[in-house]
């Protein structure tokens, strides 16, 4: 018979109180260990946390403000990060202890562990109280304070429409270029962007210069000065003028520019305005482009813009064989759509839209023969040259929104102050410009690729009803195919991106402060030179 010895647990007396306990390396009972060692030593039991009443955000040091609901995981993370001394212990658990919402108190229950003696680990539960203190964040301070701007960018364009600003506004939103603005005001001929420091304004001007041809002029106004310390306080104004040209305008090139572009034109169509201005000669398919510097050295203006566009009906198209990209040279027979039933005037013209137009299509163009142009605008015309009677610029479709049916997509707009006491014709003009911009988005895939377009809440159902309504009204099949597909639209996820955007803005703020110091040093050097 095999004997199995039974191992009995050794018991000892606690060296402090004499209670019989199982043997352990400390030779002390749990109560005595707790009385002798406090593992929460060095961890504060009461802290403060800053909360902005205006935007309901909490301060996460050093300068980041985060949105968090009461008793949420996000707020718990912010509170734990404020506790010093947790790196010396092991955090096992953390949770909330309920408090009255109006008490301005937050209580967090923590469970921690720490090795107190050799191989002896002590666990303890305790509560830390956070006192909520009110403090305005930087954004709310800027919003509440008046006349705190340091720099203003005055964006202007001398044209009779605002389609360019609608497009630029979408690019600003897509790239978040307006994140550092204090305020944005709408003006009759443009927009004003206000900034807290000059560096942010200069970055914004650089962004505008990268997307459209502009001319910039800087001025400054002395606000105060300290002669003893050789310091001064200025307000800066950046006047940014956009070239007075838009897509589908027709222009007469000055002789100097026409010569630089290989003697093209001189009557040409503006096909694109980005950081360069692109032209095409509708009679030869000759293309060219000029920079903002070239334009402002020899400025010129459009002979006609989209308000003078006339609708034509294409009767016949004969391709000549010459092509360039998506354009093809052709002889087109057409008549004014308004002349149907009134007269039988038919015109033969040459156009660059040969592979876009088919017999029966509608096209928009300019009635050059019936227009009166100043002699200064036709300075590029030679004596042996004649203006064409008509110039076509693009294909069009019957209006799809005469029945005022809702679109299944939308684009966002920058929050800004509108024009004070606008007149009725200004409101009507803005609505027409907006509708024209919406139609350009529908018809131009390249334009859609550059901006963010979002789905409506019930986009699929709206699109289905819209197409059905268009079919009932006899809209052309090609126009129906132009309707934006749902897979090309974005979901509105702005709420999920808020915190990340704020982190980016805080980084920009820090960079702006550093760069401002560099600019201030440069100004001091300039003053010394003077």
UniProtKB/Swiss-Prot annotation:
Pfam families: NMD3 (PF04981), NMD3_OB (PF21192), NMD_SH3 (PF21193)
GO biological process, one term: ribosomal large subunit export from nucleus
Residue runs in coiled coils: none
The keyword Transferase is annotated on this UniProt entry: no
InterPro entries: Nmd3, Nmd3_N, NMD3_OB, NMD_SH3
MF terms in GO: ribosomal large subunit binding
Main subcellular location of this protein, as a coarse class: cytoplasm
Location of region: Disordered: 497-530
Ranges annotated as biased composition (Acidic residues): 500-530
Entry's localization field: Cytoplasm; Nucleus, Nucleoplasm
Function, as annotated: Acts as an adapter for the xpo1-mediated export of the 60S ribosomal subunit.
Similarity remark: Belongs to the NMD3 family.
Assembly mode: Associates with the 60S ribosomal subunit.
This protein's name: 60S ribosomal export protein NMD3
Organism: Dictyostelium discoideum (Social amoeba)
Organism ancestry: Eukaryota, Amoebozoa, Evosea, Eumycetozoa, Dictyostelia
């Amino acid at each position: 018979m095999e004997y199995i010895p039974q191992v009995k647990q050794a018991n000892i007396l606690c060296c402090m109180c004499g209670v019989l306990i199982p043997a352990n390396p400390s030779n002390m009972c749990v109560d005595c260990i707790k009385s002798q060692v406090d593992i929460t030593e060095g961890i504060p039991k009461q802290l403060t946390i800053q909360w902005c009443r205006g935007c309901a955000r909490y301060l996460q040091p050093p300068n980041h403000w985060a949105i968090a609901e009461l008793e949420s995981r996000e707020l718990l993370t912010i509170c734990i990060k404020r506790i010093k001394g947790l790196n010396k212990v092991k955090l096992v658990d953390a949770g909330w202890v309920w408090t009255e919402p109006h008490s301005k108190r937050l209580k967090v229950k923590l469970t921690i562990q720490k090795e107190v003696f050799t191989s002896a680990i002590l666990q303890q539960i305790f509560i830390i109280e956070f006192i909520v203190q009110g403090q305005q964040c930087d954004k709310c301070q800027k919003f509440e304070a008046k006349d705190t701007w340091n720099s203003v960018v005055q964006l202007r364009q001398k044209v009779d429409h605002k389609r360019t600003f609608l497009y630029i506004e979408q690019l600003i939103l897509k790239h978040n270029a307006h994140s550092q603005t204090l305020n944005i005001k709408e003006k009759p001929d443009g927009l004003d962007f206000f900034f807290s420091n000059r560096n942010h304004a200069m970055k914004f001007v650089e962004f505008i210069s990268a997307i459209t041809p502009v001319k910039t002029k800087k001025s400054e106004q002395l606000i105060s000065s300290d002669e003893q310390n050789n310091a001064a306080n200025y307000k800066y104004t950046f006047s940014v003028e956009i070239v007075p040209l838009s897509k589908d305008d027709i222009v007469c090139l000055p002789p100097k520019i026409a010569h630089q572009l290989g003697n093209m034109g001189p009557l040409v169509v503006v096909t694109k305005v980005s950081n360069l201005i692109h032209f095409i000669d509708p009679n030869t398919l000759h293309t060219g482009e000029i920079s903002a510097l070239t334009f402002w050295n020899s400025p010129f203006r459009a002979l006609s813009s989209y308000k003078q566009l006339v609708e034509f009906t294409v009767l016949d198209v004969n391709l000549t064989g010459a092509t360039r990209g998506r354009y093809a040279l052709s002889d087109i027979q057409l008549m004014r759509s308004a002349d149907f039933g009134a007269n039988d005037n038919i015109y033969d013209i040459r156009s660059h839209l040969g592979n876009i137009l088919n017999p029966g299509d509608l096209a928009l163009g300019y009635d050059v023969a019936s227009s009166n142009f100043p002699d200064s605008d036709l300075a590029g015309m030679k004596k042996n040259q004649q203006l064409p009677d008509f110039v076509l610029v693009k294909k069009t479709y019957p209006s799809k929104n005469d029945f005022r049916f809702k679109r299944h997509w939308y684009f966002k707009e920058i929050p800004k102050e509108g024009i004070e006491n606008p007149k009725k014709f200004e409101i009507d003009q803005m609505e027409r410009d907006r509708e024209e911009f919406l139609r350009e988005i529908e018809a131009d895939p390249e334009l859609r690729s550059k901006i963010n377009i979002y789905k409506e809440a019930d986009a699929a159902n709206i699109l289905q009803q819209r197409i059905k309504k268009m079919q009932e009204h006899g809209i052309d099949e090609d126009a129906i195919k132009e309707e934006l597909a749902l897979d090309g639209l974005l979901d509105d996820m702005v709420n999920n991106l808020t915190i990340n955007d704020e982190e980016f803005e805080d980084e920009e703020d820090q960079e702006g402060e550093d760069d401002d110091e560099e600019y201030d040093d440069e100004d001091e050097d300039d003053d010394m030179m003077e």
